[in-house]
Amino acid sequence: MPQITLVFISLSGNTLSFVKRLSLYLADNYDYHVKQINIKDLKHETFPVKEEFVAILPTYLEGGNGVDSGDVEILTTPLGEFIAAHGNAQRCLGIIGSGNKNFNHQYCLTAKQYAKRFGFPLLGDFELRGTPDDISRLAQVIMEASSRHSSNDTQTLPNS
């Protein structure tokens, strides 16, 4: 059975709810075993992730408007520290952001900043707890990212 790891942080329960439903969807529809790592449970510990993973990050910002007056990430920085440690960023297939569209330009801004900071793609986004359509859409995106990564690993260069 193939496996995918979801590394996330959930503070209000919205992201945890989404990850649980996404995990069930991946298991039921793609026969994937999903390993979940909730950074909140680690109490600022880090360790090397040996397998490929997808990061899922809610948006918690302080100050600014996300366009011209800056912003400061709050509460979710342990996920960034975890990704930065032990070369974990190299095993991240990409990031999914969550947020509240009422915050306009700040919607999923932290995930966009992580994608730029670490050099992996922003795979998608969802609002608050996410909808069933978000679950199926992002499950497909995860499967495509995992397939691309797997095919890149198995490709060999021709002899020159």
From Swiss-Prot:
Pfam families recorded: Flavodoxin_NdrI (PF07972)
InterPro entries for the chain: Flavoprotein-like_sf, RNR_NrdI
Record GO terms (molecular function): FMN binding
Recorded coiled-coil stretches: none
Superkingdom classification of source: Bacteria
Transmembrane feature ranges: none
A single GO BP: protein modification process
NCBIfam families linked to this entry: PRK02551.1
Family: Belongs to the NrdI family.
Record PANTHER family: PROTEIN NRDI
Protein name per its UniProtKB record: Putative NrdI-like protein
Organism: Streptococcus pyogenes serotype M1
